[in-house]
């Protein structure tokens, strides 16, 4: 039994009263709000029964947590609404449906213990509802905001808008609109607890604006999604319409016919077991896909790549050795070593039907025919030829391809090239293998290790295909200018064949038999229009080219042919032009290079050395001057560390032999020495100029000239020994081009003379030296009234040396 201690007309003040409590889940009931509630908990049903037994009033308060089935005092908000029970209906499942109307706000002052239901002591809450301009402005703003909100929320119908428009009381307006808004429970509870009408309207206005922004954002998102869906549905509808029309007209479905064609190709194509299984699995997936999907295009391209590769297709090798020799000789003059290696391969293949393809590396200067020789090898073997330039390649994916997960992924260049050539046993030329570089994307030379390893390349795995592909029958030929630029692991997998520069006679033969005819044809001339005599070809070779190969020679011949073509057009097709030196100079300009000896006369302090470069051999003049000073030594010419150390070793040797060479032993205290190696802008390095520097220094200090028609090469030790060097063939060819008569080489390089053409050795005198004494005897032009060596002081000099460093000779030999 409870009793209201204040009359109904008093809905504010501090009077307390008691009544049953009905805890609510996920709903806040505002005053003047009529709402149906479903009540199922025993305590809540008992509270309704108690209220119905008295004056049908009950206190409605929201739970802080809706999931709590048995709420305690701390689980219920203190502010709620006193409501009138309008109607009650008991349902068959035991729950009760009750219709209530909110009356006024109240706050729980205390809970009254009761075993059957919640019973609370309440105090009514007084609202501040003073009419003011601010409240009127807020009322209009809230009503306008609610109207704007209703345009975005279709659940707010016109009937609700009319009901809201009819409310004049500001407090009731705020409560009614708050009841219709889908605010969170805590937001509605705060609005219920806000007694000041102006403040409540202000909070309500802000919340309505937030809801409008949320709905506008949702509409934009829905619009984008709907547009995309409409586009997809439209495309699907149009595709279906197209199929229906094609069916009516008796035409085949493009996608279906494409699948049928793919299926036929899969059945016809001979694939490896792994590739066949992969293709069947991918084709099965493709049949289940929409033809317009991006994934279908990716799968279709993948299957097409696999089917386009020559898994077992190959060309038949021509095993006629005589015919192969004829073709190789027809295409290239000289180059005996690589030709011999190809003939050996063909001979072995004739005896052993299946052998692994060799991996050759042609190393030589530009223009000597490395790439064209690879093409000629393919013609001689009756194989297809493919060339891949590796110059500047710095991405591993260029070799291995990209994985299919990337957009626009493709296989690497190896697989692409094999698809293009349509056979799995081509001659594959990897050009400029020494020009590759690496960066953050990987090292392409590391990816080539598998390609060029005969023990691994039968199962080369491209990232795009993700299948093992057999490269073992491919004849790989790589080309390089500099062997030292190739990483050692890669170099170890290849058979190195050095191709040296051409001699003057080789160039003459190549020019006469190959280049003249080629350029005449390229420029529309017949051999009757122009006459290249051997003398004129030699003149062009000597005065307009300075190279190991014949690329510049061909360029100069082409330039002459173009000039002659102009004359033929002017004078008529019967024109014939005989080349002379004057005419060559008219066509090509003044000679670019001086042909002849490095120096015209014997000079003091000037010795001619020989150098090796990537472009062939070259001569190297080394100059030394001696000036009064305090022993300063200056070495110039952009020299590397090794060459500077070689100069220091040469100087130390000269100091140790000063008396024997007739040089003042104190020269290093009284004179400054300057050693210079032209051309100053070109970097130079290496130890092979050691004896040349020593000869130049001795000549400058002893004031004895050095032969101008003699060149030398060799590394020097502190004891004067001459050590072997590399690149001998290129160096002797350079000496021959410079018309030098004599070349001094280390005795240990005698074995390399077999690589020098006999005709060169007939025209140039090669002398072997093993000590600086031998070099000086042969190189110095000693006047008749002077001696080069002062033998009487040799013993004393030797004694001085051993005093400075006791029995070092034996120790040096032991090392």
Curated annotation (Swiss-Prot):
ATP-dependent serine protease that mediates the selective degradation of mutant and abnormal proteins as well as certain short-lived regulatory proteins. Required for cellular homeostasis and for survival from DNA damage and developmental changes induced by stress. Degrades polypeptides processively to yield small peptide fragments that are 5 to 10 amino acids long. Binds to DNA in a double-stranded, site-specific manner. Belongs to the peptidase S16 family. ATP binds at residues 364-371. GO terms for molecular function: ATP binding; ATP hydrolysis activity; ATP-dependent peptidase activity; sequence-specific DNA binding; serine-type endopeptidase activity. Residues 793-815 are annotated as: Disordered. It comes from the Bacteria. Residues 601-782 form the Lon proteolytic domain. Induction: By heat shock. Keywords: ATP-binding, Cytoplasm, Hydrolase, Nucleotide-binding, Protease, Serine protease, Stress response. Gene3D superfamilies: 1.10.8.60, 1.20.5.5270, 1.20.58.1480, 3.30.230.10, LON domain-like (2.30.130.40), P-loop containing nucleotide triphosphate hydrolases (3.40.50.300). Its main location: cytoplasm. Its EC number is 3.4.21.53. Pfam families: AAA (PF00004), Lon_C (PF05362), Lon_lid (PF22667), LON_substr_bdg (PF02190). Residues 19-212 form the Lon N-terminal domain. InterPro entries: AAA+_ATPase (IPR003593), ATPase_AAA_core (IPR003959), Lon_bac (IPR027543), Lon_bac/euk-typ (IPR004815), Lon_lid (IPR054594), Lon_proteolytic (IPR008269), Lon_Prtase (IPR027065), Lon_prtase_N (IPR003111). The active site is at residues 688, 731. It is found in: Cytoplasm. NCBIfam families: lon, PRK10787.1. Homohexamer. Organized in a ring with a central cavity. GO terms for cellular component: cytoplasm. It catalyses: Hydrolysis of proteins in presence of ATP. GO terms for biological process: cellular response to heat; protein quality control for misfolded or incompletely synthesized proteins. This is Lon protease 1.
């Amino acid at each position: 039994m409870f009793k209201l201690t204040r009359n109904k007309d008093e809905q504010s003040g501090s009077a307390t009263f008691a009544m049953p409590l009905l805890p609510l889940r996920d709903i806040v009931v505002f005053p003047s709000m009529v709402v149906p509630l479903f009540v199922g908990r025993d305590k809540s049903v008992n509270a309704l029964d108690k209220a119905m037994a008295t004056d049908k009033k009950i206190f409605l308060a929201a739970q802080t947590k809706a999931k709590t089935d048995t709420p305690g005092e701390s689980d219920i908000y203190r502010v709620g609404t006193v409501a009138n029970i309008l109607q009650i209906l008991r349902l068959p499942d035991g729950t009760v449906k009750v219709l209530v109307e909110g009356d006024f706000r109240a706050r729980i002052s205390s809970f009254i213990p009761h075993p059957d239901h919640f019973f609370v002591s309440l105090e009514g809450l007084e609202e501040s509802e003073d009419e003011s301009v601010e409240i009127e402005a807020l009322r209009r703003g809230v009503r306008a905001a609610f109207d704007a909100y209703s345009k975005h929320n279709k659940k707010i119908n016109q009937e609700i808008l009319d009901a809201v428009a009819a409310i004049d009381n500001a407090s009731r307006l705020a409560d009614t609109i708050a009841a219709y808004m889908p605010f969170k429970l805590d937001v509605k509870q705060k609005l219920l607890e806000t007694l000041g009408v102006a403040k409540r309207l202000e909070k309500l206005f802000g919340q309505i604006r937030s809801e409008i922004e949320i709905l506008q954002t949702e509409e934009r998102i829905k619009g984008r999604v709907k547009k995309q869906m409409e586009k997809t549905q439209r495309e699907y509808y149009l595709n279906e319409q197209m199929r229906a029309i094609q069916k009516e007209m008796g035409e085949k479905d493009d996608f279906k016919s494409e699948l049928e064609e793919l299926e036929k190709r899969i059945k016809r194509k001979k694939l490896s077991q792994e590739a066949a299984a992969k293709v069947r699995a991918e084709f099965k997936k493709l049949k289940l896909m929409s033809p317009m999907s991006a994934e279908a295009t990716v799968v279709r391209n993948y299957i097409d790549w696999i089917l386009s590769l020559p898994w077992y297709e190959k060309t038949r090798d021509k095993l006629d050795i005589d015919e192969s020799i004829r073709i190789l000789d027809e295409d290239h003059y000289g180059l005996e070593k690589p030709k011999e290696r190809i003939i050996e391969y063909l001979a072995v293949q004739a005896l052993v039907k299946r052998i692994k393809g060799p991996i050759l590396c042609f190393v030589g200067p530009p223009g000597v025919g490395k790439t064209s020789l690879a093409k000629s090898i393919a013609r001689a073997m009756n194989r297809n030829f493919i060339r891949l330039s590796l110059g500047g390649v710095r991405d591993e994916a260029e070799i291995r391809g990209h994985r299919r997960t990337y957009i626009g992924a493709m296989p690497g260049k190896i697989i692409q090239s094999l698809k293009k050539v349509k056979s799995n046993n081509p001659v594959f030329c990897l050009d400029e293998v020494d020009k590759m570089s690496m960066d953050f994307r990987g090292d392409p030379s590391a990816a080539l290790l598998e390609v060029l390893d005969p023990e691994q390349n039968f199962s080369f795995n491209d990232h795009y295909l993700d299948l093992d592909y057999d490269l073992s029958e491919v004849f790989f030929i790589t080309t390089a200018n500099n062997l030292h630029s190739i990483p050692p692991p890669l170099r170890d997998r290849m058979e190195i064949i050095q191709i040296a520069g051409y001699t003057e006679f080789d160039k003459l033969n190549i020019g006469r038999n190959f280049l003249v005819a080629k350029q005449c044809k390229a420029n529309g001339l017949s051999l009757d229009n122009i006459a290249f005599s051997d003398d004129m070809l030699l003149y062009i070779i000597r005065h307009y080219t300075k190279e190991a190969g014949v690329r510049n020679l061909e360029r100069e011949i082409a330039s002459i042919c173009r000039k002659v073509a102009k004359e033929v057009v002017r004078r008529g097709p019967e024109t014939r032009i005989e080349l002379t030196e004057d005419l060559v100079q008219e066509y090509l300009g003044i000679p670019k290079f001086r042909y002849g000896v490095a120096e015209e006369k014997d000079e003091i302090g000037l010795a001619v050395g020989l150098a090796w470069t990537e472009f062939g051999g070259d001569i190297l003049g080394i100059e030394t001057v001696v000036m009064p000073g305090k022993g300063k030594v200056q070495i110039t010419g952009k020299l590397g560390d090794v060459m500077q150390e070689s100069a220091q070793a040469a100087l130390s040797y000269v100091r140790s032999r000063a008396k024997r060479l007739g040089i003042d032993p104190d020269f290093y205290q009284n004179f400054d020495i300057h050693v210079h190696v032209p051309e100053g802008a070109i970097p130079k390095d290496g130890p092979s100029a050691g004896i040349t520097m020593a000869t130049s220094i001795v000549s400058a200090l002893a004031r004895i000239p050095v032969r101008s028609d003699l060149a030398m090469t060799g590394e020097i030790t502190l004891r004067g020994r001459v050590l072997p060097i590399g690149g001998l063939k290129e160096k002797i060819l350079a000496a021959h081009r410079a018309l030098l008569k004599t070349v001094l080489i280390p005795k240990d390089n005698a074995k390399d003379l077999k690589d020098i053409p006999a005709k060169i050795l007939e025209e140039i005198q090669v002398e072997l030296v093993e000590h600086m004494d031998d070099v000086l005897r042969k190189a110095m032009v000693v006047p008749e009234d002077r001696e080069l060596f002062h033998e009487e002081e040799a013993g004393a000099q030797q004694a001085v040396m051993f005093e400075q460093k006791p029995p070092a000779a034996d120790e040096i030999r032991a090392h």
